[in-house]
Structures are given as structure tokens and as C-alpha cells.
UniProtKB/Swiss-Prot annotation:
<keyword id="KW-0378">Hydrolase</keyword>
<feature type="active site">
    <location>
        <position position="86"/>
    </location>
</feature>
<protein>
    <recommendedName>
        <fullName>Surfactin synthase thioesterase subunit</fullName>
        <ecNumber>3.1.2.-</ecNumber>
    </recommendedName>
</protein>
<dbReference type="InterPro" id="IPR012223">
    <property type="entry name" value="TEII"/>
</dbReference>
<dbReference type="GO" id="GO:0016787">
    <property type="term" value="F:hydrolase activity"/>
</dbReference>
<keyword id="KW-0749">Sporulation</keyword>
<dbReference type="GO" id="GO:0030435">
    <property type="term" value="P:sporulation resulting in formation of a cellular spore"/>
</dbReference>
<dbReference type="GO" id="GO:0017000">
    <property type="term" value="P:antibiotic biosynthetic process"/>
</dbReference>
<keyword id="KW-0045">Antibiotic biosynthesis</keyword>
<dbReference type="InterPro" id="IPR001031">
    <property type="entry name" value="Thioesterase"/>
</dbReference>
<dbReference type="Pfam" id="PF00975">
    <property type="entry name" value="Thioesterase"/>
</dbReference>
<keyword id="KW-0963">Cytoplasm</keyword>
<dbReference type="InterPro" id="IPR029058">
    <property type="entry name" value="AB_hydrolase_fold"/>
</dbReference>
<keyword id="KW-0346">Stress response</keyword>
<dbReference type="GO" id="GO:0008610">
    <property type="term" value="P:lipid biosynthetic process"/>
</dbReference>
<comment type="pathway">
    <text>Antibiotic biosynthesis; surfactin biosynthesis.</text>
</comment>
<comment type="similarity">
    <text>Belongs to the thioesterase family.</text>
</comment>
Length: 242
């Protein structure tokens, strides 16, 4: 596996392929892996320009999704589940569309903390550093010591901005519904995502909604409960045949 993905558990079990939130990278999923260890083979994306991946950041979500798809080289006979949080949720959705067009069906698609693609999003990537940082901090999930050190925070700004630009500029022209079972995860205090969650019905043939305590970054505050839901999903759905 190249620098685009990190494997936490090499095995022949179902693959759980994870895509991080804006500014995140493979290590963002280590807490989740701690609760799922031995239950699946977790592959976590290391986006260009993030973590140990020193290649140039990509500010085009379609290009980034194609890059992941090419690198994964998924097989119809190997069961896998896609999981993405926030920006990673949109990548998960788009990747599922592309794979299904080629007859490769995920066992399940888990879309977490993201509004559906037809919803207009507020653009923030152009904001001055202080305002942009404030927006990121308000989403929650940032360690207090990191929030208090704006010099350290500013070090991560370029990767955050690149990710936000990719999401803000994304335009979807593929209207295909996902045929695989879709699970939508949201935090109860994430008002925008909760408000627009039903909109995902437009994009999925079979959809289930899950709610967790917390806000947009409930993945970090409710990790054990998220892991329990994912474990149930891993064991719930049979492998879909094309």
C-alpha cells in the first residue's frame, strides 16, 4: 500500500476503508481502530499534503476521489465497507458512485457528518486566518492545548484550506443513487447536518439514519459508540453481487 493509505490490520477480513475530515489524515482514525481491532482490516486515507504524505495537496474533490479509487484497486470478490467523516463523507459517497458504475459494490457505505451534495454550503476557505481558525475551532474536536496555541494551529492551516476549497468547489453531475446500503451518521448538536439529513434519501436506494450525542466532531467524542455501530454494520449486510 502506497503513502495514500495506511493499513492498521492486514487481514482477510472485511476491509473498512476510512476517509478523514478536512485537515485530517490516517492517524485521525487510530482511536476508532482501537475499538475495532481484530474485527476488520482498517485502511485509512493519508491525503496528499497531510500527515506523512508529502505530495502536493489536491484541491479538486473529483480528482482526489479518482486518485483513491485507482490506488485501492478494489475487487468485486473482496468485501469492504466505505466510511468517511465530514469531507471524507462526500468522498465516500462519490467513490461509491464510481465503483458501482463499474460493478463493484461496497458491503455498506457510511456517510458521516456531511450534508447531501445538492445542499448549498457556506464558503469559508477565503476567510482571513483568525476567522478561518475560529470556524474550525467552533466545529469542536480540537484538543484544548492545540486550540490555545494558534501558532501551532496556523501550521495546519494550508491543509485545512485545501480541503475546504475542494469541498466548496465540488459540483456533482452524476445523479445515480447508491445501490449498496447507506448509513448516515450525525451528531445531535450538528444542526445543519441534522436539518438536511433526510436529503440523503435522494441519493440512496436503501438508507438508515443514526444519531449520536455531540456536535459535528462526535467521531472524536463518541468513538466507542461509533465503533459499536460500525461493528454492527460490518456484520449486518451480506455481500452484494453485481
Amino acid at each position: 500500500m502506497s503513502q495514500l493509505f495506511k493499513s492498521f490490520d492486514a487481514s482477510e477480513k472485511t476491509q473498512l476503508i476510512c476517509f478523514p475530515f478536512a485537515g485530517g489524515y490516517s492517524a485521525s482514525f487510530r482511536p476508532l481502530h482501537a475499538f475495532l481491532q481484530g474485527e476488520c482490516e482498517m485502511l485509512a486515507a493519508e491525503p496528499p499534503g497531510h500527515g506523512t504524505n508529502q505530495t502536493s495537496a489536491i484541491e479538486d474533490l473529483e480528482e482526489l476521489t479518482d486518485l483513491y479509487k485507482q490506488e485501492l484497486n478494489l475487487r468485486p470478490d473482496r468485501p469492504f465497507v466505505l466510511f468517511g467523516h465530514s469531507m471524507g463523507g462526500m468522498i465516500t459517497f462519490r467513490l461509491a458512485q464510481k465503483l458501482e458504475r463499474e460493478g463493484i459494490f461496497p458491503q455498506a457505505v457510511i456517510i458521516s457528518a456531511i450534508q447531501p451534495p445538492h445542499i448549498q454550503r457556506k464558503k469559508v476557505s477565503h476567510l482571513p486566518d483568525d476567522q478561518f481558525l475560529d470556524h474550525i475551532i467552533q466545529l469542536g474536536g480540537m484538543p484544548a492545548e492545540l486550540v490555545e496555541n494558534k501558532e501551532v494551529m496556523s501550521f495546519f492551516l494550508p491543509s485545512f484550506r485545501s480541503d475546504y476549497r475542494a469541498l466548496e468547489q465540488f459540483e456533482l453531475y452524476d445523479l445515480a443513487q447508491i445501490q449498496s446500503p447507506v448509513h448516515v451518521f450525525n451528531g445531535l448538536d450538528d444542526k445543519k447536518c441534522i436539518r438536511d439529513a433526510e436529503g440523503w434519501k435522494k441519493w440512496a436506494k436503501d438508507i438508515t439514519f443514526h444519531q449520536f450525542d455531540g456536535g459535528h466532531m462526535f467521531l472524536l467524542s463518541q468513538t466507542e459508540e461509533v465503533a459499536e455501530r460500525i461493528f454492527a454494520i460490518l456484520n449486518q449486510h451480506p455481500i452484494i453481487q453485481p
